[in-house]
Amino acid sequence: MFTIQSQANIAENIVLSFEQVVAVRTFEHNGYVVVAVLTGPIFSQAERQELLQSIKDMVADTLEISQSHILASYDMELFRAMDNISDNEKDKLLEKAMQMQSI
């Protein structure tokens, strides 16, 4: 018997395959997959950006969706808020994640 996994669950499993990643939380909403990542120490901003880009590349390729629909962040507030969220809260978090991508 096959189980159908949500895109968020698949993304979570992909992100956990990166050795730098300690924890991850995901959700999907309005066609977007939001990924909040906790890592061990990464001191270089370039390395941090490279890891997020690698995560977006791998998730987009696996899920066969546009990278513009993958929102990845190191934001701790976003990570905490994703613990147990309602649909109304997802709208707010999705908006915050989208704003962070444009920075």
Show where each model-derived region lies.
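N-terminal, intrinsically disordered, polar/charged segments of Gram-positive cell-envelope systems
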Residues: 1-13, 97
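Short edge beta-strands and adjacent turn/loop segments
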Residues: 16-38
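Short, non-transmembrane amphipathic alpha-helical segments
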Residues: 8-18, 44-67
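Short glycine/threonine-rich beta-strand-turn micro-motifs
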Residues: 32-42, 78-84
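Polar/charged, Gly/Pro-rich intrinsically disordered segments
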Residues: 73-103
